């Protein structure tokens, strides 16, 4: 059965003052120093990695990526561009791949340089200081160059609602996440990698 605390109602819009208060309450600006570029990746330390490794019971691999779209569609208007630089021969073939990573069909990792609030990014840095003419000056994916290994937690919002997938106009709320925790008998911790399942792939297939 669906969790009675989960909701399909559209969350109300926040006022500017409420959004400002929420931003300040959740902000990590200065938490790890003014020059930090890792953000909450700092929470993943050696002890976290040891605890995560101790949880492994099976050698199962769970892929989270999606196939790269090579044809345009409404959900992937900018498909991957493939170009063969050196024709296949007896020994090798070389290609070039151009990716627009922010299509909704493309698996990617957003960094701290991706979003800004009132013209400022992580640690209060102005956008003009973060974004260069061709690349990020700060907060790029290079901040995660050492990788991250931690416990992964799945919150299955669709299963908690007892539906195969959420409709396109439905939202995931705090109540949904808490209901999914109860449904999966898990609790999300500060150093966990969170995976939220809404059934989007299933919905796209069904539609």
Regions found by a protein language model. Name each.
Residues 1-207:
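Active-/binding-site microenvironments in catalytic and ligand-binding cores
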